């Protein structure tokens, strides 16, 4: 399986993960270890940045996993930029997952505010990874202003509904010149495999791993699914057909018998 490059950083795993909803820090680390994920997103709201022994942050830093702070909870571009600057100072990283969702019920991303924040953050030297609707026009605009990737949703956050937005994801993948990471709604390893099969460069999974009865085993399942999906894509999937096509035609064989 080929490596993925974002802003010059090489990732051997195409499975990115989150840190929310786990029953404990130990369960989180067991799951992440089994998944072999090399990038983990985490919310500033859930961390005690002044506490060097924070039970989420410290084990992640010890594992040398790349940390991707997110701006979850921001309702405007201004709030998102402020959160990103706090994260850069506290975690010494200029990478940020840009999330702006003013609606607390459905957590739908605000595309207009996201574009405004992305432009400002890029000017400030951030590597911006924006979480957005599966909107091909918006994703292209974000690419044009300098985002290093785009992160369209498969379905609503935490819904486990899979790739409900597949037709639009396929358009985004087809026209994008930056990595496409499908984020949100991936509820089963089969969803992750499908995402990679249709050409997504990576997926970000959190809820499906965190709420599983055995998070570590689910982490491994997602790792294998992502590897299989990417391998299938790189191998070249067969074309879908309406009509049947025999794998072993009998025409010549039957003619020789007559």
UniProtKB/Swiss-Prot annotation:
Q: According to its UniProt record, where is this protein located?
A: Cytoplasm
E.C. designation(s): 2.8.1.10
Q: In which pathway does it act?
A: Cofactor biosynthesis; thiamine diphosphate biosynthesis
The reaction(s) catalysed by this protein are: [ThiS sulfur-carrier protein]-C-terminal-Gly-aminoethanethioate + 2-iminoacetate + 1-deoxy-D-xylulose 5-phosphate = [ThiS sulfur-carrier protein]-C-terminal Gly-Gly + 2-[(2R,5Z)-2-carboxy-4-methylthiazol-5(2H)-ylidene]ethyl phosphate + 2 H2O + H(+)
Its domain of life reads: Bacteria
Q: Where is the active site?
A: 97 (schiff-base intermediate with dxp)
The top EC class is transferase
Q: Which GO terms describe its cellular component?
A: cytoplasm
Q: Name one Pfam family in it.
A: ThiG
Q: Name one GO molecular function term.
A: thiazole synthase activity
**For this chain's UniProt record, which GO biological process terms are given?**
thiamine diphosphate biosynthetic process
Give a yes or no for keyword Cytoplasm in this entry: yes
Please give the SUPFAM superfamilies that the UniProt record associates with this protein.
ThiG-like (SSF110399)
**Can the keyword Cytoplasm be found in this entry's annotation?**
yes
Q: Which UniProt keywords apply?
A: Cytoplasm, Schiff base, Thiamine biosynthesis, Transferase
Record-listed 1-deoxy-D-xylulose 5-phosphate binding positions: 158, 184-185, 206-207
Q: What does this protein do?
A: Catalyzes the rearrangement of 1-deoxy-D-xylulose 5-phosphate (DXP) to produce the thiazole phosphate moiety of thiamine. Sulfur is provided by the thiocarboxylate moiety of the carrier protein ThiS. In vitro, sulfur can be provided by H(2)S.
Quaternary state and interactors:
Homotetramer. Forms heterodimers with either ThiH or ThiS.
Which protein family is named in the record? Belongs to the ThiG family.
> What is the protein's name according to its record?
Thiazole synthase
Q: Taxonomically, what lineage is the organism?
A: Bacteria, Pseudomonadati, Pseudomonadota, Gammaproteobacteria, Oceanospirillales
Chain's gene name:
thiG
